[in-house]
């Protein structure tokens, strides 16, 4: 069932000694697949107003985007106090630093995931992000709930590809020289 979600999201975490941190999330999406149940506005105005509405109620704000790298770079310049933008759209992983903003994008279709280890100093307000790109493969035990979601979307992906290419796994060329 489709339910409206807020323009921002706040999640509170605590460590072993009870120290808490409030993390705010702001998000935008490009209108690449418009749906009648999704509202698309100017992403720069929306993410700026979302940031302004949440920044004084949390310790740190992160961005979640489905936008082009060019869009994410512009957002990073617009909101230089967001230490991390977790993005998507290009389908190939990337890691970019714009000022003090780290922009990470994993590969599409659950091929990879970035694992972000975040440290926040409550006294200085400094956030440190250490990120690792991890390939999703058989060495990782599948979470049943996540695995069923991935399987559903992989099935949809294969069906959609077969609408365009009858035999998508067919070898059509064998290079004698390795290609980069």
Each language-model region and where it sits:
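A short C-terminal boundary segment appended to hydrolase-like catalytic domains
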Residues: 120-180
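Acidic, metal/ion-coordinating pockets
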Residues: 1-141
């Amino acid at each position: 069932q489709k339910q409206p979600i807020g323009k921002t999201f706040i999640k509170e975490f605590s460590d072993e000694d009870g120290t808490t941190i409030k993390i705010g999330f702001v998000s935008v999406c490009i209108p690449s697949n418009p749906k009648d149940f999704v509202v698309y506005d100017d992403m720069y105005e929306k993410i700026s107003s979302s940031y302004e509405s949440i920044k004084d109620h949390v310790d740190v704000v992160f961005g979640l985007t489905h936008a082009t790298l060019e869009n994410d770079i512009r957002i990073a310049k617009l909101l230089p106090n967001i230490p991390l933008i977790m993005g998507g759209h290009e389908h190939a992983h990337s890691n970019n630093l714009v000022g003090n903003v780290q922009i990470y994008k994993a590969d599409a279709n659950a091929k990879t995931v970035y694992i972000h280890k975040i440290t926040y100093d409550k006294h200085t307000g400094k956030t440190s992000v250490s990120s690792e790109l991890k390939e999703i493969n058989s060495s990782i035990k599948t979470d049943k709930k996540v695995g069923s979601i991935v399987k559903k979307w992989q099935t949809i992906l294969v069906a959609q590809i077969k609408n365009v290419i009858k035999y998508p796994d067919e070898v059509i060329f064998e290079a004698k020289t390795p290609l980069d």
